[in-house]
């Protein structure tokens, strides 16, 4: 996937002939979709043109099917923004856990663009596309979100020159994190310094119950120029190489 144009193997396995055929097939499928975890993520957002919500979702689902048929090995997540003052019902699509090399080598770019022009572009406005770096020293998790049905999504824009102090302050609080909490720093694609925090959770109740405990430390308040907190709904029918967690 690309912005304005959605673009949305593992280790060798030696298998003895004594293994059942179905087991061999399972191993082969896992090897095809497994990726080494790197620090980079691509996060983008689009919204439906007025009156095109149904058409956009149908076209986007068709486009994701193109990725499957092309045997794309990227893991593609899709979320709908649920609680937001500005972006309700917008679609966030993202892929996580990449090395620089893997993110630079998407599947069949020309064919991807062609299918996107046919199925998605007539119904969508693209409103953001960035490459982010996962910050393990600020986080709890490995940078590839658990595909839970809900997530809290926080975007933070800082005053110029405040990035280092912000990261030092958050690193000092890392041990207090409750549950999966993933911080990413924007590398390219918008105003910097800016950050995204993603907190995957099974339910809205889990997000709300932890809200007070997950507030940013007071010492960073003067560093922030803008902060937005939204909640997302995972779209199980808009995933590639991602299996959503069962509802609880």
Q: What residue ranges belong to the model's regions?
A:
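Bacterial N-terminal signal peptides
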Residues: 11-25
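N-terminal secretory signal peptides that target proteins for export/translocation
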Residues: 1-7
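Short S/T/G/P-rich N-terminal loop/turn motif that feeds into the first structured element of a domain
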Residues: 25-248
């Amino acid at each position: 996937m690309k912005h304005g144009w959605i673009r949305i193997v593992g280790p060798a396995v030696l298998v003895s002939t004594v293994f059942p055929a179905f087991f061999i097939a399972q191993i082969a499928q896992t090897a095809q979709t497994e990726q080494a975890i790197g620090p980079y993520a691509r996060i983008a957002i689009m919204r439906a043109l007025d009156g095109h919500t149904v058409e956009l979702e149908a076209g986007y689902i068709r486009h994701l099917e193109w990725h499957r048929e092309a045997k794309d090995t990227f893991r593609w997540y899709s979320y709908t923004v649920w609680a937001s003052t500005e972006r309700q019902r917008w679609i966030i699509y993202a892929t996580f856990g990449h090395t620089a090399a893997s993110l630079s080598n998407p599947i069949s770019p020309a064919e991807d663009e062609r299918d996107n022009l046919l199925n998605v572009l007539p119904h969508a406005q693209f409103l953001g596309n960035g490459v982010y770096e996962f910050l393990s020293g600020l986080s709890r998790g490995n940078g590839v979100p658990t595909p839970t049905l809900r997530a809290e999504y926080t975007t933070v824009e800082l005053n110029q020159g405040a990035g280092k102090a912000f990261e030092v302050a958050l690193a000092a609080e890392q041990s207090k994190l409750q549950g999966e909490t993933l911080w990413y720093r924007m590398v390219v694609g918008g105003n910097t310094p800016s950050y995204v925090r993603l907190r995957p959770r099974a339910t809205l109740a889990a997000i709300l119950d932890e809200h007070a405990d997950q507030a940013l430390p007071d010492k960073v308040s003067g560093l922030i120029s803008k902060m937005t907190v939204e909640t997302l709904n995972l779209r199980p029918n808009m995933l590639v190489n991602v299996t959503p967690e069962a509802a609880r």
